[in-house]
Regions:
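Sequence/fold signature of self-assembling virion shell proteins
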Residues: 1-48, 53, 58, 168-193, ...
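Amphipathic interfacial helices
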Residues: 207, 217, 224-226
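Assembly/oligomerization interface modules of large self-assembling protein complexes
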Residues: 30-113, 166, 170-172
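Short, conserved, surface-exposed binding loops centered on an aromatic residue
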Residues: 214-219, 257
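Signature of extracytoplasmic/envelope-associated structural regions
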Residues: 4-7, 63-87, 142, 146-154, ...
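Alpha-helical scaffold segments that mediate packing/assembly in large oligomeric complexes
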Residues: 116-205
Length: 335
């Protein structure tokens, strides 16, 4: 069954194209789309990318990178240790250290559609056009974080009903850390957290991760943060920053009032509730193959829907595997 494209949808699509600085053209068929021309030059590809910057505080503070290869190893230069001194004989010297983790990009597709009937209701509300694209950007940004914290594998056909947090879409940061250096950076053996347990509280656990797993030269890194699972924070009634998925700016005062083990701490969206991790936000990387991005906004009369889609080659990496330390959610027993 084919539907007639509503007039309000044509108006919305025209406004959307203007926001992408693309000349509007209503085809005779009534079908229209924003997508990448087949023979476009690389310089024109920007019109079909989706910029998620500004969608949330966390997405703005991690590392989003366009790269030129679909696989490889990230390289981080230096380890935060001392590189200055003197030698009685000749010049002082010290070898520069490099660290990194392997990465593999895979095809990743995001999609959100509305029926004509749903859009008719929404079109009567103010600022509908801006809200529609803002929602899709935020949805993609949230999914990028969701996969980063929960991803465990790359399935040929994903199952969102079984893996509601994208566990089968890509290999996220925590899963990468569990295989890095034979798992040295993640506590995977069973332990008890609470009074009389192996660790008295979250502060004690975070301090152990910092002092035993983060290299000595990086323990005082100003950007080091503690990410606390919601279940751990609730158990100890910690009042931590928990709006990392919102587009806002934190002040020094905000950060001072949200701390664990003397470091800024927050509750990340979608991170498993009993996990605790210490790292710098820039160490959390989302990599996209340059020129692989394809954003589309499409009217599909055959199904009576208007659809937003974003296709790209994407993957996750840790800039420095040693700069990530965590306790696995399956290892902890709360006592």
């Amino acid at each position: 069954m084919s539907h007639v494209t509503p007039a309000y949808l044509k108006q919305y699509h025209e406004e959307l194209m203007k926001s992408f600085n693309i000349k509007y053209k209503n085809e005779d068929t009534g079908y229209f789309t924003i997508s990448q021309p087949e023979k476009a030059s690389p310089d024109a590809w920007g019109c079909s990318t989706l910029d998620v910057k500004g969608a949330s505080w966390l997405i703005d503070n991690i590392s989003l990178q366009d790269i030129t290869g679909a696989d490889g190893t990230t390289i981080t230069i230096g380890d935060g240790s001392l590189y200055t001194g003197r030698a009685k004989e000749g010049r002082f010297h010290k070898k520069l250290k490099t660290n990194g983790t392997p990465f593999l990009l895979s095809e990743t597709d995001s999609c959100a559609s509305l029926t004509y009937e749903e859009m008719a209701v929404m079109a009567n509300t103010g600022n509908f056009s801006n809200e529609m694209i803002a929602f899709f950007k935020k949805a993609v940004a949230r999914d990028m974080l969701r996969i980063g914290f929960n991803g465990k594998m790359i399935a040929e056909n994903t199952n969102p009903e079984q893996y509601k947090n994208g566990e089968d879409i890509n290999i996220g940061w925590h899963a990468l850390a569990k295989t890095f250096n034979k798992g040295s950076q993640v506590i995977s053996d069973a332990f008890a957290l609470g009074k009389g347990g192996d660790f008295a509280d979250v502060h004690d656990l975070a301090d152990c991760l910092i002092t035993s797993k983060i290299p000595e030269g990086q323990r005082e890194e100003p950007g080091l943060v503690v990410m606390v699972g919601a279940q751990l924070a609730a158990r100890e009634r910690l009042k931590l920053f928990n709006m990392a998925d919102q587009p806002l700016t934190l002040t020094a005062g905000d950060m001072l009032g949200s701390s664990v083990a003397g470091r800024f701490a927050f509750i990340p969206p979608f991170m498993p509730g009993k996990r605790l991790a210490v790292t710098t936000l820039k160490n959390l990387q989302i990599l996209t193959l340059k020129h692989s991005q394809r954003y589309r906004a499409e009217d599909i009369p055959q199904r009576g829907v208007y659809e937003h889609g974003y296709l790209r080659e994407e993957g996750y990496a840790l800039g420095d595997g040693y700069l990530y330390a965590a306790s696995d959610e399956n290892a902890v027993t709360l006592v």
